[in-house]
Amino acid sequence: MTDDMTKDNINQQTLQRGLKNRHIQLIAIGGAIGTGLFLGSGKSIHFAGPSILFAYMITGIICFLIMRSLGELLLSNLNYHSFVDFVQDYLGDMAAFITGWTYWFCWISIAMADLTAVGLYTQYWLPGVPQWVPGLIALIILLIMNLATVKLFGELEFWFALIKVIAILALIVIGLVMIFKGFSTSSGVSSFTNLWSHGGLFPNGMHGFILSFQMVVFAFVGIELVGLTAGETENPEKVIPKAINNIPVRVLLFYIGALLVIMSIYPWDIINPSESPFVQVFVAVGIVGAASIINFVVLTSAASACNSAVFSTSRMVYSLAKDHNAPESMAKLTQRKVPRNALFFSAIVILIGVTLNYIMPEGVFTLITSISTVCFIYIWGITVICHMKYRKTRPELAKTNKFKLPLYPFTNYLILAFLAFVLVVLALAQDTRVSLFVTPVWFILLIVIYKVRKAKHQ
């Protein structure tokens, strides 16, 4: 099948199921662990103290339930390739248009931020290289890899995620040895008692604990990426449930395990919020080049986020085009079943975004990324609402689906209540309040564009 297809047979094309079980398992881990754990955890610990562990536990449970609802929806119809497909089915064309372009915008802004970060992290070793050069090189490499086959995307994510896993496991193992041996640091003896002997588990009270959710929730952004791979996964009925069901264990091990060890080695009030706690732990045991090691991990983590962005934005535009919510040329596939036009389009927009990042005032760029994180809450919420509609209108499908969201509809309302709570927290925090009130402008813009397009076609 060639690229020169007519509009009539575009919809007959399908993406290739080239992602294997090992790819999906590591993509699930990579989606749940961002650069925030390595760089931003010092700030979140400083904010909430040991109570941050409970915030991660609660948010991890909610994200697991969101993923269960997403998994049930995707496996109810194997023709679903993304959020757009089931939103189209259950909430209509306008909701699908808004959801698809919102998710696309979310990942475009993530790519802008992380490509900029790639330049910054590279300058740690090569200070003379202009910041834009490593970012541009990274984008070109990722684009070439994604243009080849979906399997190459999976391979990249597999190794990127593996680097993160090794770094976290190294921290936990080294940390546990330090704790059980009573290792002395400049701050005292490493011990689990450090968790409660410096003001208790809630040293900043409920106020600090509640405000910490703004950082914790954003750490889980991207966890839903597994859902976007369903249409390109071998044997999705077995692989997707396995990846989703492992989320609680991974959250417990990687987030809670790492932070628990860090706060046992160093009392929470000693940890420098502007430094990586990982570097502090590795330096304490005399690991040479600890900062370079973590810089490498964070660099690959940022590259992983960019890779996910290139993949997810192209697949979202492809899905939108299949439903006539984007130019039909974006639905064309190459002989290797890759949406080449959609990939080029998203890569060009990412490149423009990175260029604008150097021109725009810093506050504008920060506002854009803040708006995108608020939009992720919308994506999670719309998924849960679609799940409720599916259960209500397609009970026969729900009966035969082996992968169900537990305790429906209680868990649906629990998720929506939690997301509403996070929005309230965002309104309380000064640095996120503006983005919360500006975000509706994005949705109004999409509604206007949709209405104009519809009127034009009629």
Curated annotation (Swiss-Prot):
Where does it reside? Cell membrane
Superkingdom of the organism of origin: Bacteria
Q: Which GO terms describe its cellular component?
A: plasma membrane
Q: Where are the transmembrane segments?
A: 26-46, 47-67, 95-115, 125-145, 160-180, 208-228, 251-271, 278-298, 342-362, 365-385, 409-429, 432-452
Is Transmembrane tagged as a keyword? yes
The family database entries (InterPro entries) matched by this protein are listed as:
AA-permease/SLC12A_dom (IPR004841), Amino_acid_permease_CS (IPR004840)
Task: Alphabetically list the UniProt keywords.
Answer: Amino-acid transport, Cell membrane, Membrane, Transmembrane, Transmembrane helix, Transport
GO biological process annotations for this chain's record?
amino acid transport; transmembrane transport
UniProt membrane topology term? Multi-pass membrane protein
Q: Per UniProt, what is one Pfam family of this protein?
A: AA_permease
Q: What does this protein do?
A: Probable amino-acid or metabolite transport protein.
Its family remark reads: Belongs to the amino acid-polyamine-organocation (APC) superfamily.
**Protein name stated in the entry:** Uncharacterized transporter YdgF
This chain's source organism reads: Bacillus subtilis (strain 168)
